UniProtKB/Swiss-Prot annotation:
This is RNA polymerase sigma factor SigI4. Interacts with RsgI4. HAMAP family: Sigma70_SigI (MF_02064). GO terms for biological process: DNA-templated transcription initiation. The gene is sigI4.
């Protein structure tokens, strides 16, 4: 049985693969790209505009950074968080607003680091006040230790060994992607944005992964065998072409040893069939 740390790591990878992560703020909010400005500078600039009263920008910022917030919450809790029904998400969202309102670039420096600290702090406070979480070990323990972690968390070294094994599997998956000319960054930018589209692509990837002949041809040619695949799926050819990278990535996962991620894709298909 996979331990808590393994599940957390896989869920974090899952969130990454779902396309929901940090987007380039210059593209989202219309802030002109300045030369020699880092991403953190751009985010800080957005926060300053929000603090100066730009309500619409704040709403856009919260909406677009929802995936990042979910990643923090999920990592801290050690499981996937459903924003529609999760009390923890509400706690995290309030903490995210708190981070925006309380951020001072001259004091706090980088917003994402500051936000991570505030949200982690609030989620851990929530865990401490709820007995149902008494046995949960926050994922932040498995990252680099800092003063915050030393203050709140307790060591349990046997997780570290299995963490290494999972990281090796993830790295192997990343190397497989590179053989197809795909990077993890490509998945962030090119994966389907809508839930229905993602679930459709997952079902296509499963058909591809379960057909040994097609899958082996894909591995050999380093591309989707479109002509053969189109005879097995009832979708437009352009749908497959447009989501090629995501479909390849999911099919590789489904043929991998990443059982927790595979379980998520199975659940996605079951929801789609209902």
């Amino acid at each position: 049985m996979l331990n808590v740390q393994l599940k957390i790591f896989c869920h974090a990878a899952l969130i990454f693969l779902e396309v929901v992560y940090l987007f380039e703020p210059n593209l989202i909010y219309g802030v002109k790209k300045r030369e020699k400005k880092s991403r953190s500078d751009s985010i800080n600039h957005i926060i300053i505009k929000i603090k100066n009263g730009d309500i619409e920008l704040k709403e856009k910022f919260i909406k677009k950074y929802k995936p990042y917030l979910l990643k923090i919450i999920s990592s801290t809790l050690g499981r996937y968080v459903d924003p529609e029904v999760s009390e923890e998400y509400s706690v995290g969202l309030m903490a995210f607003n708190e981070a925006i309102d309380g951020f001072n670039p001259e004091i706090n420096g980088n917003f994402t680091n500051y936000c991570n600290m505030v949200v982690n702090h609030r989620i851990i406070d929530y865990i401490r006040k709820n007995k149902k979480y008494s046995n949960v070990i926050p994922f932040s323990y498995f990252e680099e230790r800092n003063d915050f972690e030393e203050k709140y968390l307790v060591s349990d070294s046997h997780y570290l060994y299995e963490n290494i094994e999972v990281k090796e599997e993830i790295l192997q998956f990343e190397q497989q992607l590179k053989q197809f000319g795909i990077t993890l960054e490509d998945l962030v930018m090119n994966s389907p944005k809508h839930k229905d589209s993602r679930e459709l692509c997952i079902s296509i990837a499963r058909i591809l992964s379960e057909n040994d002949k097609l899958f082996e041809k894909m591995i050999r040619k380093k591309c989707i065998p479109l002509s053969e695949l189109m005879g097995l799926v009832n979708v437009h050819r352009k749908t497959v072409e447009r989501n090629r990278k995501f479909i390849i990535a999911v099919s590789l996962i489904l043929r991998s040893g990443l059982d927790e991620i595979k379980q998520f894709f199975r659940a996605s298909e079951e929801r789609r069939e209902k």
